[in-house]
Amino acid sequence: MSSKTLDQQSAVVIFSGGQDSTTCLVQAIAQYGLEQVHAVSFRYGQRHEIELRCSLNICQKLGIKYHRMIILEELSGLTENALMNQEIKISQSQEADYPNTFVPGRNALFILYTAIYAYQMNITNIIIGVSQADYSGYPDCREGFIRSINTSINLAMDQAFTIQTPL
């Protein structure tokens, strides 16, 4: 590992403003303290813009000092799905047995960008509100994926990040 020392007593939460990530944010505040918790949100062309507005409001109400909004609008030009295109009716599954709201690589991008932010802010702990038990067919919510990307970002940045999925 590199000589850069990351703070193990702080965390950054991948924060959509939805129910799961809000639960993670509140849990992180309880565990690490308000001053030690950062939030990162993503605008990627998603249908539920209200969640992003909620993320801003929730961070403000909770007193989160460090809330970063990362823009990934280009993602909507790379993939078509019901989560990003309001003209597509949401359905439970398609040919590949994934719901048509599946955005390929979304959580991988979120985790990578958040790890870059965490590295710059000297933060070890990355929290994301995915749950294998409730993954709705999304392969990037599975425990194996989370373990794999944790290893990959640690190797890519020569650090010892810990990705937490407390739900």
Task: Go through each PLM region and give its residues.
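ATP-dependent adenylation/nucleotidyltransferase module used to activate substrates
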Residues: 2-167
